[in-house]
Amino acid sequence: MVLQMIKDMNLNLKVMQGVYIEAEMNNFGCPWGKVYSENELKNNRHQNLVKVKKLIKLANSYPDVIFSLSAGNEATVDWTDHYVSPEKVIEYVKLLKEGTRQPVTFCENYVPWHHKLEALANELDFLSIHTYPVWEYKHINEALEYTKQNYYGVANKYPGKPVMITEAGWATNANGKGIDPGNVSEDFQERYYHELHKWCEKENILTFFFEAFDEPWKGSPDANEPEKHWGVFYENRAPKRVMKPYF
């Protein structure tokens, strides 16, 4: 287990540990999601609770490694294929806060924080947003400014809450479905990475860059599917351009 290895080897690493909560409701607004039977949804609700309880155990077993907890990931945004109501997420958040000492968050696209997650935000210790300018057809030249708009839009709405970026990145390949192939490359990824890092360091914004390694299992069978190409390393662990200076 990764957490045990970090502890045993005394590695200078901290982890945000989260649960991936599955669909508890059908989201007919998701263009790629399936329609779940009531039995499937019932089972998902049960398994989600099991996952939350397991997270509580992990948090208490590795208090020096796990620095924060997330009650889910992209489960309330309009296009999600694993929809869970904000009210149910609040229940999971309360369970985590009652059973652990670590601060609790929920990782979500920046949009829902503006219009449907106010009650959830009040329960969280800090907010976590995802921002992907390239998915919203922004050119690399306007990418950082768009990220700033996404961030400050949420931060200014909740002035009493710390806000971190738990996903931000730039793909290195695309097939034209959702992302213009001319707007992705290792050069563009490198530029966005460094511009984002410089800004976040200046503003003291904790950020997770998405992501470490390519995930070829994601998305469609098309080898150029953009979901497969967000890593700063290839699947075989070879560094892409942005990481080559460090290896």
Feature names for model-found ranges:
Residues 181-188, 199-247:
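Aromatic-rich peripheral "rim/lid" segments of glycoside hydrolase catalytic domains that contact
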Residues 19, 71-73, 93-114, 160-171, ...:
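Aromatic-lined carbohydrate-recognition surfaces of secreted/lumenal glycan-active proteins
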Residues 13, 17-19, 23, 28, ...:
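Aromatic- and acid-rich polysaccharide-binding/catalytic face
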Residues 1-2, 50-57, 107-119, 148-152:
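Alpha-helical scaffolding within the catalytic cores
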Residues 10-14, 63-68, 99-104, 122-125, ...:
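Loop/turn elements at helix/coil->beta-strand transitions in domains of secreted/extracellular proteins
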Residues 52, 85-90, 142-149, 189:
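Charged helix-capping and loop-helix junction motifs
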Residues 2-102:
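Substrate-binding cleft of extracellular glycoside hydrolase catalytic domains
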Residues 77, 81, 129-135, 157-189, ...:
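Active-site clefts of carbohydrate-active enzymes
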